[in-house]
């Protein structure tokens, strides 16, 4: 079973929405080359990912992995939180 999971696609992106229960929206940026002008252009694609424990918050950098369909649009799950977003609510005011 471990060898099978290594074949699954993984992506790294930033959480843009955590308003749903056990679901986050992750924006994944990729660089693609323009076919005519050869300039590298940034493309963003959003994935809905399963967050079992509701740990992710907006701004977190996360790794997601492909999984079986969990709902109509959800085919990814959060594997780990790479970098946590800064918490501005607890910062002291000037």
Curated annotation (Swiss-Prot):
<comment type="subunit">
    <text>Part of the 30S ribosomal subunit.</text>
</comment>
<dbReference type="InterPro" id="IPR012340">
    <property type="entry name" value="NA-bd_OB-fold"/>
</dbReference>
<dbReference type="Pfam" id="PF00366">
    <property type="entry name" value="Ribosomal_S17"/>
</dbReference>
<keyword id="KW-0694">RNA-binding</keyword>
<comment type="similarity">
    <text>Belongs to the universal ribosomal protein uS17 family.</text>
</comment>
<keyword id="KW-0687">Ribonucleoprotein</keyword>
<dbReference type="GO" id="GO:0019843">
    <property type="term" value="F:rRNA binding"/>
</dbReference>
<dbReference type="InterPro" id="IPR019984">
    <property type="entry name" value="Ribosomal_uS17_bact/chlr"/>
</dbReference>
<dbReference type="GO" id="GO:0022627">
    <property type="term" value="C:cytosolic small ribosomal subunit"/>
</dbReference>
<keyword id="KW-0689">Ribosomal protein</keyword>
<comment type="function">
    <text>One of the primary rRNA binding proteins, it binds specifically to the 5'-end of 16S ribosomal RNA.</text>
</comment>
<dbReference type="GO" id="GO:0003735">
    <property type="term" value="F:structural constituent of ribosome"/>
</dbReference>
<dbReference type="GO" id="GO:0006412">
    <property type="term" value="P:translation"/>
</dbReference>
<dbReference type="InterPro" id="IPR019979">
    <property type="entry name" value="Ribosomal_uS17_CS"/>
</dbReference>
<protein>
    <recommendedName>
        <fullName>Small ribosomal subunit protein uS17</fullName>
    </recommendedName>
</protein>
<dbReference type="InterPro" id="IPR000266">
    <property type="entry name" value="Ribosomal_uS17"/>
</dbReference>
<keyword id="KW-0699">rRNA-binding</keyword>
């Amino acid at each position: 079973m471990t060898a099978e999971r290594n074949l699954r696609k993984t992506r790294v992106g930033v959480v843009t929405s955590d308003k749903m229960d056990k679901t986050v929206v992750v924006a994944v940026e990729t660089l693609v080359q323009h076919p005519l002008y050869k300039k590298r252009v940034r493309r963003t694609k959003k994935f809905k990912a399963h967050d079992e424990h509701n740990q992710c918050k907006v701004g977190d950098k996360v790794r997601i992995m492909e999984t079986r369909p969990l709902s109509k649009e959800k085919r990814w799950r959060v594997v780990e939180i790479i970098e946590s977003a800064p918490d501005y609510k607890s910062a002291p005011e000037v």
